[in-house]
Amino acid sequence: MKQSVLVLGNSDSGLYDFRKEVLTALMQEGYEVHVSVPDTGYLEKIKKLGCICHETVMERRGMNPLKDGKLLLFYRKLLKTIHPAAVLTYTIKPNIYGGVACRLAKVPYLVNITGLGTTLEHDGPLQKLIVLLYRTGMSGAGCVFFQNEQNLAFMRQKGCLKKRTKTRVISGSGVNLEE
């Protein structure tokens, strides 16, 4: 039986446009790749790559604790169903709630911080809440990837990363210009 990898994101189009090569490389390495994202019209394209897709209900920009709690429960159930060898998370809600679900299920996971977003731009109660959520979501990550040094410095300064947490700054992501 193939080992599986679960990829959590908040956008099927973003996953397809910016992470298609990652998905393909994982499958070429022999993994069964599961993808959990909301369906905005790209899930069929992701399925055609060979991935197993799990449509996910998520408010990308909302801050409703009940809906976010449902997302956390959905991730927990998905982990129990798939039993992945590892989980890759992208974007804020999958990073936070996927990270918590993985830690509770004792599933190894990697976090990718693609940017900090507008909620972390200004000091205040909302920033404090998001920092606390990030700290909780990333506390068990095997590695946290950043796309620039500034985001890494911010997360360190705010105490979102434990000293033992491995971090890497990668050269970012983008659209494959050859397609």
Short names for language-model regions:
Residues 89-95, 113:
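Short His-centered aromatic/hydrophobic patch
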Residues 112-128, 157-158, 163, 176-178:
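Acceptor-binding helix/loop patch of EC 2.4 sugar-transfer enzymes
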Residues 41-42, 93-94, 150-152:
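Alpha-helix capping/helix-boundary segments
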Residues 54-55, 135-179:
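Donor nucleotide-sugar binding/catalytic pocket of nucleotide-sugar-dependent glycosyltransferases
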Residues 17-18, 66, 70-73, 108-110, ...:
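Nucleotide-sugar donor phosphate/pyrophosphate-binding loop at the beta->alpha transition
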Residues 8-66, 154, 165-166:
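N-terminal strand-loop element at the rim of the active site
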Residues 37, 88-89, 146-147:
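Short beta-strand scaffold positions
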Residues 4-6, 102-119, 134, 145, ...:
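Active-site proximal beta-strand in glycosyltransferases
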